[in-house]
A protein has these predicted regions:
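C-terminal regulatory/interaction regions
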Residues: 99-100, 104-125
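Beta-strand-turn-beta hairpins that frame and shape the catalytic cleft
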Residues: 1-5, 25-28
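Context-gated lysine
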Residues: 2, 88, 118-119
Length: 125
């Protein structure tokens, strides 16, 4: 039996209606547009997911996708709460999914997003 939990994540990564889905028995977190990557990535990886997403965000903010991802004062807390679920799989919508310690990748993503969007705030001024 599968048990799914809907987790509202307003404005993470986009609009007020954003949400993640967590399957409790397999510990799979469906992460929507978090961890987006481009190109032709492998279907599943076991390391480096947050690093790939960080690089994508840096490129995206210099392209027509600038400002498409939101990071606000509640975003880090939302990512920390998702990490507390202890996901073993991160099911990614646009890029490689991840098998392993998903909590670490979520926390690394929070730091990566802070890095990208603090730089953007300085640029936008």
């Amino acid at each position: 039996t599968k048990r799914f939990r809907l987790i509202p994540t307003p404005h993470l990564p986009h609009g007020w209606d954003s949400a993640m889905l967590f399957e409790e028995s397999d510990r799979t977190l469906f992460v929507s547009d978090l961890f987006t990557d481009s190109g032709d990535p492998a279907p599943v990886i076991d390391s480096g997911l947050a690093d790939r997403a960080h690089q994508f965000l840096l490129r995206a903010e210099q392209s027509l996708f600038a400002h498409s991802t939101n990071f606000n004062p509640s975003s880090r807390g939302q990512l920390e709460a998702l990490a507390e679920l202890g996901p073993k799989t991160l099911a990614v919508m646009h890029g490689s999914s991840f098998s392993g310690e998903g909590s670490q990748e979520l926390l690394q993503l929070a730091s990566a997003m802070e890095d990208v969007f603090k730089k953007q705030a300085v640029i936008d001024g």
